Amino acid sequence: MAKPTVSDAQLMIQIAQWGTSLGVEEAMPQLFADDFDPDTANAMDNPAVRKMLMFGESIATLTKNDLLSKKLVNDWLWIEGIWSRVGPAALKQRARFNEPRLYENFEALAASAT
């Protein structure tokens, strides 16, 4: 895995700013609350799940295409932990729309981090 570059760090900061404007910092506590059930969560009904799926898939797409360092992302975010909370909702959306590409990059990044 290539060493992260200054460009990777700059992009990471931009993504962090985008995450702030999306409301990622409000979504995360909801996803990790004791009363949140990943198995019953629905991306269509839960804004926190939707935000984190979009955020995670965007970051994962950048890493997949070598536009952002996977090493840097895994040092920054607990991708597999986030996926464990929103992944079941993503899989339901895949099945509902019969579209295997939905959130595939996020899932792959989470799997590669373990």
Predicted region positions:
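Acidic, Ser/Pro/Thr-rich low-complexity regulatory regions
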Residues: 1-114
